[in-house]
Amino acid sequence: MTASSEHASLQPVVSVIIPTFNRLEYLRPAIESVLSQTLSHWELLIADDGSDMETRAYLTTLESLPRVKVIWLAHTGNPGAVRNAALREATGEYVAFLDSDDVWMPMKLELQIAALRSCVDRRWSYTGYVCIDETGRTRTYPGTRPWIPHRGAILEHLLMQEVEIWTPAVVVERRLLAQVGGFDEKQPVFEDYDLWLRLACHSEIDLIDQPLIGVRSHDQHYCGGGIRMLASRHRSLSKMYRLVTDSRLRRVVGRLRAQCTLDLASLQGNTHRLAAARTLLSGCTLSWRLMDWWAGVLWVSLKLATPRGLHALYRRGRIRHRSVST
């Protein structure tokens, strides 16, 4: 065996990235699900975001494993920055993400890598999922959206929020991640969705329509909402408006960004009127041609101009009216 072929045989096919901050009771099964993969050519990069001593002690025991590397970080609370720190250490041809409270099924990596290598035009992949509870049992939760699989060109589906891609479901070419710049560390929340949008601008996506990941629901599970959620979507759509070259899709992005701007300004107006005014002004340059935009601006402007006391009274009146009507 030549030196170059020996080096190639030692090179991992997949770099698995797990960011973690405490949650030791869920971290253990997450790591065990990586160790149980039927595909053996992987490396595991665990980026620790300043966890407590108990979690750090457990991670220290893993450093003796030949394919595991722990990256010790000061706490930032920024998932994108933590994942990027691990991404800079990755050496695999592909990168797979796993959250510290979720798990993989044993065949996940093997099936995804085989499918990606058989279809060179698709440089990233995702899978179906099941919901699990704190104990790892499969559960069905009220309000869960039905699984609607999409493959191929999915940018418009992503923009319209018609496709659900969980972070632990994704495997992506490392070169493609480098091409789009990794995670945006300035995203308030939903930095994964922002990355999917940028990946979809450069490549079609493959799908393994099987539930190969378990997404855990528990009390510590974070769900962004309100202003942070809208601010994140606004930032992503603004980037998409600059990146998308197809004229029809660009109009779609423009309309979505205009509506998101109005929604964000309206919500900001409840507590931060100056921020709401700045948000409205930021949307004018891209949205001034849309008739619906000006109707929305008028509505939000009236809301901002109304004294807070009257506005609160108006809102209470609307709620009371609705309750009487029903």
Task: Enumerate the predicted regions with their spans.
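Conserved donor NDP-sugar-binding/catalytic core segment of glycosyltransferases
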Residues: 107-140
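A conserved acidic beta->alpha catalytic loop
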Residues: 33, 40, 48-58, 75-76, ...
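Conserved nucleotide-sugar donor-binding catalytic segment
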Residues: 16, 88, 127, 146-236
